[in-house]
C-alpha cells in the first residue's frame, strides 16, 4: 500500500471515530483478501466493513467507485465472513459494507506547513473539508453506507 493510501485510511478511521464508531481492525487480512477498516457502532449494534479508495484527479475509475466491482465485493464479503467466524462475539451484530471515497489534492510541499506530515486533525472535521494529514491534502469526498450487499 502506498503512503497516500495509508494516509487516506487513517483519516477515514479518525472520521469514523468522530461519528461514534470504534475501530476493531485496520487492514485485516484473510486468505481471500483484506478489509481496510472494520468498525463497530455500539449504539446501533452494527459492524461496518469499510473499503477506502483514495484517489487524485484524473483517475480512470470515478474516484475509486469503479474499483469496487463485483469481484472486489466478493473478496470483501468472503473476508468479512472469515472475520466473523474468527470473532464469534460479533455474530449477533448486523453487518454492512461501506465505501469511502477520499480525494487527494497532492502532497504538502516541504516548508509550507511547519507541522506538515504530522499535523493534528481538527476536533470535528466534515465531509468535503480539505485536511492536511500525513503530508497530503485530503478531502473526504463521499461515504456510501451499505454500498453493496453480502
Curated annotation (Swiss-Prot):
GO terms for molecular function: nucleic acid binding. This is UPF0102 protein sll0189. Coiled coil: none annotated. Gene3D superfamilies: 3.40.1350.10. InterPro entries: Restrct_endonuc-II-like, tRNA_endonuc-like_dom_sf, UPF0102_YraN-like. PANTHER family: UPF0102 PROTEIN YRAN (PTHR34039:SF1). Belongs to the UPF0102 family. HAMAP family: UPF0102. It comes from the Bacteria. NCBIfam families: YraN family protein (TIGR00252). The lineage of its organism: Bacteria, Bacillati, Cyanobacteriota, Cyanophyceae, Synechococcales. Pfam families: UPF0102.
